[in-house]
Amino acid sequence: MSSPKEPLSVVVAGGGTAGHIEPALAVAEALRDGYGATVTALGTARGLETSLVPDRGFDLRLIEPVPVPRTPNLDLVKLPFRVAKSLRQARQVLRDTGAHAVVGFGGYVSAPAYLAARSLGIPFFVHEANARAGMANKLGVRLGGVGLNATENSGMPGQVVGIPIRRELAGGEDATAAERGRTQWGLEADRPTVLVTGGSQGSVSINSAVAGALDDLLGAGIQVLHAVGKRNSLPTARPGYVPVPFIEDMQAAYAVADLIVCRSGAMTVAEVTASGIPAIYVPLPHGNGEQALNASAVIAAGAAKLVDDADLTPQRLVSEVRDIVGNPATLHRMSAAARTSTVGDAAGVIAGLVATAAGY
């Protein structure tokens, strides 16, 4: 009899923001649940992964981040030394875990992970969630990684697989999650609810617009669940207005929301669309313009609207929200458009590709 194989071991790399971490964890769960894999997450001490990864039951190993300066400065001079240190750390993690494969999702830890995997002869995959690929992921494919894209024309070679999202967010309406949300945030079931979030750090422009629009929104019978960001001061709660620093239970938040106002990071767009929630996207006005592109397909499908950051005044916010929430037919049409534009099980597809490449 042949001896049984050792369990599949995979390292996922995608630290920093939730947009990098959540797809990594979705794939980690698909590998664990579908293939019995041991999955280790690679991250840094400064990212959200320090809480998100352990909370989801995975081991987290830390390395030094390697941000690439966009302009010549002292950090650029230090870059080769930082890369060398992070590469050594990443190689050690791959050896310690006996990794059979690596999957990177962009961010500061991905480049060292790609370099380490190549140097050790370990197959590796590069997932790009944004409509425009980042530098670390482009490097990963050039190094021999298998490219996996969320959308066409990202500028990175590879097949289109969509964005991995948590299974519990892909099932649409969830009465249990909605009741949990109403209980923990004190929301009323018979009032329309607008969820507002600027991401884990919050958004000054979105927060300011909400502050100026609040009287009109509440006066129209709309209740607002507002994640202001961990670093921002918490506004005073009012009847119908629930400000919180950050929302851990996004399943419940999506379940109670009739409409969401948020940035259009790739992961956010994927989760919101899968949850069937009409959206008003306010793209981050920085970077290479990928946030506007991330939302372009769902906007074209009629599932969302876009408001430029510079145009987000309190008056514009009130107008857009009331146009959607105040019209049940519009809400229904946008929700249906969101559900029909959702991509399939990207996490399962990626897990299958990884397991096959590793010989499992």
Curated annotation (Swiss-Prot):
InterPro entries, sorted: GlcNAc_MurG, Glyco_trans_28_C, GlycoTrans_28_N
List the residue ranges forming a coiled coil, or say none.
Answer: none
| Pfam families, sorted | Glyco_tran_28_C, Glyco_transf_28
Name the Gene Ontology biological process terms: carbohydrate metabolic process; cell division; cell wall organization; lipid glycosylation; peptidoglycan biosynthetic process; regulation of cell shape
The record, for SUPFAM superfamilies, names: UDP-Glycosyltransferase/glycogen phosphorylase
Q: At which positions is UDP-N-acetyl-alpha-D-glucosamine bound?
A: T17, A18, G19, N130, R166, S200, I247, Q291
Q: In which pathway does it act?
A: Cell wall biogenesis; peptidoglycan biosynthesis
Give the keywords, sorted: Cell cycle, Cell division, Cell membrane, Cell shape, Cell wall biogenesis/degradation, Glycosyltransferase, Membrane, Peptidoglycan synthesis, Transferase
Gene Ontology cellular-component terms for this entry are: plasma membrane
Bilayer topology annotation: Peripheral membrane protein
Task: Name the enzyme group at the top EC level.
Answer: transferase
Q: Which reaction does it catalyse?
A: di-trans,octa-cis-undecaprenyl diphospho-N-acetyl-alpha-D-muramoyl-L-alanyl-D-glutamyl-meso-2,6-diaminopimeloyl-D-alanyl-D-alanine + UDP-N-acetyl-alpha-D-glucosamine = di-trans,octa-cis-undecaprenyl diphospho-[N-acetyl-alpha-D-glucosaminyl-(1->4)]-N-acetyl-alpha-D-muramoyl-L-alanyl-D-glutamyl-meso-2,6-diaminopimeloyl-D-alanyl-D-alanine + UDP + H(+)
E.C. number, please? 2.4.1.227
Superkingdom of the source species: Bacteria
UniProt subcellular location: Cell membrane
Q: Main site of residence?
A: membrane
Which GO MF terms does the UniProt record name? Answer: UDP-N-acetyl-D-glucosamine:N-acetylmuramoyl-L-alanyl-D-glutamyl-meso-2,6-diaminopimelyl-D-alanyl-D-alanine-diphosphoundecaprenol 4-beta-N-acetylglucosaminlytransferase activity; undecaprenyldiphospho-muramoylpentapeptide beta-N-acetylglucosaminyltransferase activity
Which NCBIfam families does UniProt cross-reference here? murG
Q: What's this protein's function?
A: Cell wall formation. Catalyzes the transfer of a GlcNAc subunit on undecaprenyl-pyrophosphoryl-MurNAc-pentapeptide (lipid intermediate I) to form undecaprenyl-pyrophosphoryl-MurNAc-(pentapeptide)GlcNAc (lipid intermediate II).
UniProt family annotation: Belongs to the glycosyltransferase 28 family. MurG subfamily.
Name recorded for this polypeptide: UDP-N-acetylglucosamine--N-acetylmuramyl-(pentapeptide) pyrophosphoryl-undecaprenol N-acetylglucosamine transferase
Name of encoding gene: murG
